[in-house]
Amino acid sequence: MFLQPLLAKKIIAEVKKMYEREVIIVNTDGLIMAGTNDERVGQFHEGALICAKERRSVIITKEDETRLKGVKAGINLPVFFDHDVIAVFGLTGEPAEIQPFGELLRKMTELFIKESRHLEQSQWRERMLESFMIDWLQLKEWSPSFLEKAQLLGVDLSSRRQMILIQGYEWSPHDIEQMARSWKSSYPADLFIRWGNERILINHEVPQHEQRDRLLRKILHICSFANTASSQYTAAGAGRAVASSSLTDSYEQAEKALAVSLKRKTPIFEEDLKLDMCLTEISPGTRNEFPQRVLGKALEHQELMNTIRTFFHHDLSLKQTAEDMHIHINTLRYRLAKAEQLTGLRFDRTEDVVTMYVALYFLDQDTK
């Protein structure tokens, strides 16, 4: 591994905050990559080259300034990664004074590089997982390269799989990492993938004796963490368990379940969908037109629409609706009569009640 100039500049920027003397970072060929003095960047530093080749600290004296090219009195320290010298850290000043700082800054630099490398590897794996998942959902037949990726990622293609979609708001990489660690502590073979800015995709490897309650508890735990992290509601939809070769079916089911979860504000398993299963199949054009056709002029009265929603929420109970809205029951009867007048529908006819419910379903879901 070689230290990249961009990372070297970031390290120098951090060093500047805690150390006032001149500092440089030099590559293993002796070229200065970054420093507190920009004029020295790109220059050759013979002392650093010796330091890199001999894998040892090199003290530069005033006398050395005349015989070694590009040096200033100070100290050069090798920076190690996995036992290899990847750069040289140089400090200008009296060696006895600056050596303690030099050792401290070198250790800090090595830790910084390790963290950067870990993040780089993590991001590489995330990109590879996302690419692999897209292939898995799109390929009609598994190609040799796909099978090779599966083997590299340790994915068992013979197991049954279940797709789970979680949707919220943008999470930080740290939040994603924490959620992934929590999930994989229970299901280590699962693929936990950031799926766009607002979604997480979980490719769940279904155990032989799956316990749905356990899976639901884990989904609720992740949603609870995500809600806290973003201060917004997080929805979750789960498809059915399928063979690995039929993963697209489970993904489409998870999409349907997620749409219902956004409305009901609770995690949804596709296998539990009943009326929603039919309603999610209706075309967008019909979904947009139907509320206008059914509710008509009632849509212009916000208080009236809130009353209708609350009435349905309480299963058409006059008493519970009036209590929830803090209004007299006669006021509620007046509003419902007004709704019947504007819509031409009646709350004592089953067909009209179903029609109005479906109109509200489409209206509320499509305005989210």
From Swiss-Prot:
Domain of life of the organism encoding this protein: Bacteria
InterPro entries found in the cross-reference section: CdaR-like_regulators, CdaR_GGDEF, Diacid_rec, PucR_C-HTH_dom, PucR_C-HTH_sf
GO molecular function, one term: DNA-binding transcription factor activity
Pfam family, one: Diacid_rec
GO annotation terms (biological process): positive regulation of DNA-templated transcription
PANTHER family found in the cross-reference section: CARBOHYDRATE DIACID REGULATOR
Stated family: Belongs to the CdaR family.
Name of the featured protein: Uncharacterized protein YsfB
Gene that this sequence comes from: ysfB
